[in-house]
Amino acid sequence: MLILKDEDIRRLVTMKEAIAAVEKAFGELAKGRAMMPPRSTMMLEKGSISLMPSYLQETGTVATKIISIYAQNPAKGLPTSIAQIIANDPETGKFIALIEASYLTALRTGAVTGVAAHYLAREDSKVAAIIGCGVQGRTQAWAVIESRDIETFRCYDLSKERRRAFAEEMSRTLEVEVLPVDRAKEAVKDADIIVTATTSKIPVVKKE
């Protein structure tokens, strides 16, 4: 059985490739050539665990993601979401791969935003706002810049330290201006693209 860890995915898959794969999967699902049943979620006292099965006819790929979401994990030095993917042989059901998928989940979720930015955002978009400066915020920013020629990101997070660290890291990584701001309202003002990457249960971006 093939075993892949997060560092393998980082080395093997680029954001551009992830965006192309997600766009292809959306198309196959729309054409009825893929199956993606609703996720099954078990709610626990401190978090949730979900099962997400899928099948892609063109490649004969059968895979199920198991993902846990625990909002308090960062305080324990752990990521909010932890995921694994099990792949099966479609002919026999035999396990053929086990994939550590926390990074892949962030990459894939970012890629969805990349597809959306390509088709929905104006071609002349130059300013983007990122609300939430965790792992997901990073892949969201990466995906947006793969789809549009963004010149400036404005980032907001409840943690001043996180937004400053995000701005420093992502300005180097993406080679664009990334500005940390003190309020979500400042981040989204006059932004061409707004991305939320937060587990907040109350609105962070408001109509006014």
Predicted feature descriptions by range:
Residues 120-127, 149:
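Short helix-loop-beta connector
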Residues 129, 152-154, 179:
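A structural signal for isolated positions on well-ordered beta-strands in alpha/beta enzyme cores
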Residues 133-134:
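Glycine-rich Rossmann-fold phosphate-binding loop(s) that bind the pyrophosphate
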